[in-house]
C-alpha cells in the first residue's frame, strides 16, 4: 500500500475523537442557549394573525398577549379565577343611569338602566416598546414618512432593524383607536357582534366607517392591492368611549352587562397607537413585508424580535416594561426570562423527543407515548411513569373550559330548522355519536363527553342530557340511550332505516378543510360507521381552508365536525351566546360566533335576561332552562371537553396551568444551571461507534504496514508485471468516468 494512504488513515484515526468531540452536538439551539434565561416551547398550528383586532386562536394569543396588554388580567394563582388591574390603577365600578340621566343606586334592574359608565384610570408608568413608528421629527411627523424602499436598511426582517427607534407613554386616545378599529367592517372582528350589542354607538361607528370608505372609492369586498385605505379612527365619532384627560377615559354601555369587566381582560381592548397604523401604511414598509398582522406594537413584558412562522417566533424582553413585582417571588421583578422561543414543530413525536432531551421546557404527551409516559395511580388518577418521575418531570392535568361539537347547519332544509321531524333526526344522530368511544379511540381517554355546551368548572354545566344520555342513579353517571331509541327517532323523523319517503337512502354531507390529514381520515371512517347504524350515508365535501371559512360565513354547508369554542371568560354566558340568534354567523355577515345559525325565540328571551343579571340563584335557574332548550333542539351533537396534559421539567419555576389568561409567560423562571446539567447528562454522545472505528482503522493500518515491509520474491519480470501483481493483490480498480456516473445515478 502507498505510504501516503497509510499516513492518511492514521491521521484520520488520530483526529476522529477530536472531531467527534467538537462536532457531535444534537442541540437545536445555539451554543450557550441552555445557560441563557430563555424559555423554549413549540407550536404546531399556523399563525395567521397577531393583530389584536382579529386574532382569536389560542396559539396566537399565547404569543400576542405577552406583547400587548389589556386593561385587566387574571390573577395567576387565584382559583376560582379573579380579575386584577393590569394597565389600570383599580378595577372600575359601573355607574348606572336611568333614561332621564338620574344616577341609579346599588344594583338596579336591567330594564331601568339606559346607560352604564365605567371610569378607567391608567397607571402613570406605562410606555410602549421601542419601535420605528414612534420615531418623530421636530414637527411630530414620522421620520420614515418620506422614505423610499432604497433608503431602508438592507435585508430588513424586523421593525427592530430600523436605524431609529423610539417610544411614548400610553394615552386614552389609543383605546379609542383600538375600539373604533373593531368597528371597521374590513377587519371582521370576531367579537364585534357581541360587543356592539352592549357598547354604545358601535353599530353607528361601523356605518360611518363604511360610509367614509365608500366616499373614498372603496368597493365592499375589494381592497386595493397595495395600500388599503387608512381611516383616521381618531376622528370618527364614537359615543362608546369618552376621553377625560391624559390618564382617564370612560367606557359607556347602552345597557346593563356585569360581564363587561371580563372583556377588559381580552386583547381586543389592548391600546392601539395611531402611529403604528400610520407606519404600517407607508408604501416602503408594505413593500418590505412588515405589517401589523405580523408585528404588533405593545407595552407588554416582551416585544417581537423574530417572526418566521414556518421556523421560529422569538420574543425578547421589553426594555421599557415597567417595574412590576409579584407576591409569588418577593423582591424580584417581572418578567423572569429574557427571551421566549416558539419553535414550529409540525409533528408531535419530534417535539416529544426534544422535550425528553431537555431542549423544550414544556410539552404535551403524544397519543402514541401516553401509555409509556403515564400510568394510573391507586386512586385512578393519571400519574407519571416511574422513569419520568425519576427524571424530575412534573405532570399537570385539567379539563379545559372548551367544547368541541358536531354541528348541524340550522339553515339547511334537511338537518336544520325548528320542525319536529328534523329535531328527531338531530337527536337520533346525537345518540349514535358515542363521544366516550371517540375520546377513548382518538384522545387516549383524555377528555369527558359533553352533556351540553357549558364545560365542567363553569356554573351551569350539565351533569346529563335527558334526550341523549340521561342520569343513571345506580351508576352515578349519565348513560347514553340505546341504539333502538335512535332508530325509533329516525322513524318519527320520516327516515325508517335511513330511507326517505321517495325510497332513496338519506345522504348527508360533511364539509371540512382537513383533506389529506391522516387523523381526520380515521375520524371520518368512525363517523361513517356510526351514521350507518341508523341507515344514514355520510359523504365528505373537502375544501381549502379559506373556501371552508367562506362556506361557514355564507351558510353553504350541512354538517361540520370538531368545531370548538374556548372560554373567553369564566361565565356561562360566554358559551350560551354561541346560540343567540343575533350572533348567527350568516345573519351577522361573518361577525357572529353562532356558527350553526341556531334561532329560537324562547332561547333568545332567556339569554337576554340572564346576560344582564348578576350571578345569583335566579340567574342560575334561567341558565338551566336555556341549556335544556338547547339539549332538546340539538343544534349540535355536544361532543366533548378535552383534558389538557402538560409536562414540565424540574428547572421550570412557577409554572401553573391557566385556562383564562395567556399573558402568563412573564411569571416563568428558569434554573439555568440545572437545565444545562440535565441536557449534558441526557445527551452524552455514544462512544462505542468511535471506539469501533478506531480499532478497525488501527488494524487496517497495522496489516497495511506489515504488508508494505514484507520483501517481495525476486523475479525477472518487468516492472509492468510487478505492477500488475500488486494491482491484483490489493484489488486496485481504476475509477473511470463511467463508474462515477453510474455511482452518482
Predicted regions and their residues:
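Detector for C-terminal structural segments
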Residues: 258, 312, 396-404, 428-467, ...
Amino acid at each position: 500500500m502507498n505510504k501516503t494512504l497509510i499516513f492518511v488513515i492514521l491521521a484520520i484515526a488520530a483526529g476522529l475523537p477530536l472531531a467527534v468531540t467538537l462536532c457531535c452536538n444534537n442541540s437545536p439551539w445555539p451554543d450557550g442557549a441552555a445557560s441563557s434565561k430563555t424559555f423554549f416551547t413549540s407550536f404546531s398550528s399556523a399563525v395567521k394573525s397577531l393583530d389584536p383586532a382579529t386574532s382569536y386562536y389560542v396559539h396566537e394569543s399565547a404569543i400576542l398577549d405577552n406583547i400587548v396588554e389589556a386593561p385587566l388580567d387574571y390573577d395567576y394563582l387565584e382559583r376560582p379565577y379573579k380579575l386584577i388591574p393590569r394597565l389600570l390603577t383599580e378595577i372600575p365600578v359601573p355607574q348606572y343611569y336611568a333614561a332621564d340621566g338620574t344616577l341609579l343606586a346599588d344594583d338596579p334592574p336591567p330594564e331601568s338602566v339606559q346607560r352604564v359608565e365605567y371610569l378607567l384610570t391608567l397607571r402613570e408608568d406605562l410606555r410602549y416598546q421601542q419601535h420605528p413608528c414612534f420615531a418623530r421629527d421636530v414637527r411630530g411627523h414620522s421620520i420614515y414618512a418620506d422614505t423610499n424602499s432604497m433608503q431602508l436598511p438592507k435585508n430588513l426582517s424586523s421593525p427592530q432593524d430600523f436605524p431609529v427607534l423610539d417610544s411614548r407613554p400610553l394615552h386614552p386616545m389609543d383605546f379609542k383607536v383600538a375600539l373604533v378599529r373593531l368597528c371597521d367592517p374590513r377587519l371582521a372582528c370576531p367579537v364585534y357582534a357581541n360587543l356592539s350589542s352592549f357598547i354604545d354607538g358601535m353599530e353607528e361607528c361601523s356605518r360611518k366607517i363604511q360610509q367614509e370608505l365608500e366616499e373614498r372609492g372603496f368597493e365592499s369586498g375589494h381592497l386595493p392591492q397595495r395600500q388599503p385605505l387608512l381611516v383616521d379612527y381618531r376622528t370618527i365619532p364614537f359615543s362608546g368611549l369618552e376621553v377625560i384627560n391624559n390618564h382617564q377615559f370612560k367606557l359607556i354601555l347602552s345597557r346593563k352587562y356585569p360581564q363587561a369587566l371580563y372583556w377588559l381582560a381580552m386583547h381586543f381592548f389592548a391600546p392601539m397607537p395611531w402611529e403604528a397604523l400610520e407606519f404600517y401604511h407607508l408604501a416602503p414598509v408594505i413593500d418590505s413585508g412588515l405589517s401589523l398582522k405580523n408585528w404588533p406594537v405593545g407595552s407588554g413584558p416582551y416585544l417581537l424580535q423574530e417572526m418566521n412562522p414556518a421556523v421560529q417566533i422569538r420574543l425578547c424582553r421589553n426594555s421599557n416594561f415597567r417595574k412590576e413585582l409579584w407576591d409569588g417571588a418577593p423582591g424580584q421583578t417581572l418578567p423572569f426570562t429574557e427571551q421566549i422561543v416558539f419553535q414550529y414543530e409540525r409533528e408531535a413525536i419530534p417535539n416529544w423527543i426534544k422535550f425528553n432531551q431537555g431542549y423544550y421546557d414544556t410539552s404535551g404527551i403524544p397519543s402514541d407515548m401516553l401509555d409509556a409516559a403515564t400510568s394510573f395511580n391507586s386512586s385512578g388518577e393519571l400519574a407519571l411513569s416511574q422513569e419520568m418521575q425519576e427524571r424530575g418531570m412534573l405532570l399537570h392535568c385539567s379539563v379545559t373550559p372548551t367544547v368541541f361539537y358536531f354541528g348541524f347547519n340550522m339553515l339547511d332544509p334537511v338537518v336544520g330548522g325548528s320542525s319536529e321531524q328534523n329535531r328527531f333526526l338531530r337527536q337520533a344522530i346525537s345518540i349514535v355519536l358515542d363521544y366516550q368511544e371517540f375520546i377513548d379511540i382518538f384522545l387516549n381517554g383524555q377528555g369527558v363527553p359533553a352533556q351540553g355546551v357549558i364545560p365542567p368548572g363553569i356554573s351551569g354545566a350539565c351533569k346529563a342530557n335527558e334526550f341523549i344520555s340521561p342520569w343513571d342513579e345506580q351508576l352515578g353517571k349519565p348513560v347514553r340511550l340505546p341504539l333502538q331509541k335512535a332508530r325509533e327517532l329516525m322513524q318519527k323523523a320520516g327516515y325508517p332505516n335511513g330511507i326517505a319517503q321517495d325510497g332513496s337512502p338519506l345522504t348527508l354531507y360533511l364539509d371540512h378543510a382537513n383533506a389529506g390529514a391522516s387523523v381526520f381520515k380515521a375520524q371520518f371512517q368512525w363517523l361513517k360507521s356510526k351514521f350507518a347504524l341508523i341507515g344514514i350515508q355520510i359523504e365528505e365535501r373537502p375544501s381549502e381552508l379559506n373556501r371552508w371559512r367562506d362556506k361557514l360565513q355564507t351558510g353553504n354547508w350541512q354538517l361540520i365536525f370538531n368545531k370548538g369554542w374556548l372560554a373567553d371568560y369564566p361565565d356561562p354566558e360566554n358559551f350560551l351566546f354561541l346560540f343567540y340568534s343575533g350572533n348567527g354567523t350568516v345573519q351577522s355577515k361573518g361577525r357572529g360566533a353562532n356558527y350553526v345559525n341556531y334561532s329560537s325565540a324562547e332561547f333568545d328571551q332567556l339569554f337576554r335576561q340572564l346576560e344582564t343579571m348578576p350571578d345569583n340563584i335566579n340567574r342560575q335557574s334561567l341558565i338551566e332552562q336555556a341549556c335544556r332548550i338547547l339539549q332538546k333542539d340539538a343544534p349540535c351533537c355536544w361532543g366533548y371537553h378535552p383534558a389538557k396534559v402538560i409536562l414540565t421539567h424540574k428547572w421550570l419555576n412557577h409554572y401553573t396551568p391557566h385556562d383564562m389568561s395567556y399573558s402568563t409567560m412573564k411569571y416563568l423562571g428558569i434554573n439555568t444551571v440545572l437545565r444545562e446539567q440535565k441536557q449534558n447528562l441526557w445527551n452524552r454522545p455514544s462512544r462505542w461507534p468511535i471506539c469501533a472505528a478506531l480499532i478497525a482503522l488501527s488494524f487496517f493500518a497495522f496489516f497495511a504496514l506489515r504488508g508494505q515491509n514484507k520483501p517481495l520474491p525476486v523475479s525477472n519480470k518487468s516492472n509492468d508485471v510487478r505492477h500488475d501483481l500488486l494491482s491484483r493483490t490489493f484489488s486496485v480498480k481504476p475509477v473511470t468516468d463511467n463508474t462515477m456516473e453510474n455511482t452518482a445515478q
